[in-house]
Amino acid sequence: MRLAVISSVSMIFGLLVAGTGNASAADICTGYGPQTPRDITSISGTNKRLFTLAPATAELNLCNIHTHTNAEHKGPGFSVFAGKGPHGGYKCNDSDMLTAAELKDPTNGKGAFQGIKPGDTIEVHWVHSSCDIKPGKGLGSCLSQKCANPQLRVETQVFLVVNDKNALNFADFTYGGNMKNGLHQAKSLPSGTGTPVVFAGSTTGPKYTQAKCSPLQVTWSVRPQCAKVHVGSLYKWAKDGNVFQEDHSHGVRQLVTAQELLSPIR
């Protein structure tokens, strides 16, 4: 029995860790639950494999924080297409309206957090789990041998990275050992960027496509507008070290558009 549990955890861990992969849009996977990312302005979807949405973050443990360069989702504030593939996705609508000062990289390309620079769009994921775990490296930290099938909830904010100390400080949204009511929690979550769109979906990352679907069930909460974040605060997060061992931004999964792979948004 113990070997079976370890095998199950190993399999799920492998499914959670994002890799790279190519798929033909003509080949739609079948038999899977709803997939992510999506256009959050469209509420339609015909996937019938519904599941109970995860509780609010206050009832779950924060298990991981990571970023993707360019938004994986498409939304009202991030609708500028950035291309196909793992380096595609969507950009904040104001990306082309930044000043020269906002676009200046204070490290001249040598920032500690790799894969971003001023002017880039990033999508940040605060991943929460119903398991009794501690935050750590990779999404595998969201489960354990004793909790191999957790309820997962991802809080999401898309940021426009700028060189401006008056912009948001990423440190305000990190972990730093913060506990509340016995649960691991982010210091805070972004506000003022619209009511989050909540829906049933899956894990993301460039490993998956419409032909290669993720089997995991994830509740998503995606804020619809971009916010500016100071690039220096992201560099500092990596330079100082973080429990997630995040030192670079990840690639994206291309938008899921097939109705049979999307849940209806209530």
Predicted regions and their residues:
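Boundary at the C-terminal end of the N-terminal hydrophobic targeting segment
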Residues: 23-26, 31
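Short N-terminal edge-element motif at the start of the domain
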Residues: 34-133
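Non-catalytic macromolecular-recognition regions in eukaryotic signaling proteins
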Residues: 56-57, 61, 66, 146-149, ...
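C-terminal segment of classical bacterial N-terminal signal peptides
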Residues: 13-23
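Bacterial N-terminal signal peptides that target proteins for export
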Residues: 1-9
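Short helix-loop boundary/capping segments
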Residues: 130-207
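Long, compositionally biased interface segments
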Residues: 203-266
